């Protein structure tokens, strides 16, 4: 009996972490829906567009300005930016809360993004600034254990493709 109790306690402790990862997965997939609409505006080649599917991989790097331009366009699509291309806190929080269990991560994600935004506020080129910000955000999520694994993301991509 003590072994069963210990297992239940471990599951109870792990459940919030899994919920956080699943929320992040859902937000990532939802945000990614704007990518097709932003491809031309941000001058993404097919090859660079494919890179977005690897965003959560450990070795993914933001080396191309166009990726930042695409993220800027996608953020505008969902009305997540102010006129000065900075995060609109309220709209971003509401966007995250619109996903199942989004309230679990909304405030934390806004704080992470804002913290990264402050680090790169000196960058005048919006696309490069947003690219650096996205890299910082990704690293922060990985450090906090809320980043979805590539296996989880690939499973979702496959399930979505099969559903179409």
UniProtKB/Swiss-Prot annotation:
Entry keywords, A to Z: Disulfide bond, Olfaction, Sensory transduction, Signal, Transport
A Pfam family matched in the record: PBP_GOBP
Signal peptide as annotated in the record: 1-19
SUPFAM superfamilies found in the cross-reference section: Insect pheromone/odorant-binding proteins
GO molecular function: odorant binding
GO BP: sensory perception of smell
Disulphide bonds in the chain: 38-73, 69-127, 116-136
Record has Lipid metabolism as a keyword: no
Tissue spec: Antenna.
InterPro entries attached to this UniProt entry: Odorant/phero-bd_Lep, PBP/GOBP, PBP_GOBP_sf
Entry annotated with the keyword Hydrolase: no
Superkingdom as given in the UniProt entry: Eukaryota
Task performed by this protein: Present in the aqueous fluid surrounding olfactory sensory dendrites and are thought to aid in the capture and transport of hydrophobic odorants into and through this fluid.
Family per similarity comment: Belongs to the PBP/GOBP family.
Protein name (record): General odorant-binding protein 1
């Amino acid at each position: 009996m003590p072994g069963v109790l210990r297992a239940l306690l471990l599951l109870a402790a792990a459940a919030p972490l899994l919920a956080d990862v699943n929320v992040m997965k859902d937000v990532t997939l939802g945000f990614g829906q704007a990518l097709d609409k932003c491809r031309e505006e941000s001058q993404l080649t097919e090859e660079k567009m494919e890179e977005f599917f690897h965003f959560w991989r450990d070795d993914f790097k933001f080396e191309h300005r166009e990726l930042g331009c695409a993220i800027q366009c996608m953020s505008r699509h969902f009305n997540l930016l102010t006129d000065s291309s900075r995060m609109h806190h309220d709209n971003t929080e509401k966007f995250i809360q619109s996903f199942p269990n989004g309230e679990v991560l909304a405030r934390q994600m806004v704080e992470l993004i804002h913290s990264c935004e402050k680090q790169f506020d000196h960058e005048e080129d919006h696309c490069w600034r947003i690219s650096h910000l996205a890299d910082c955000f990704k690293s922060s999520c990985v450090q906090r254990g809320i980043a979805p694994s590539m296996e989880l993301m690939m499973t979702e991509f496959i399930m979505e493709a099969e559903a179409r």
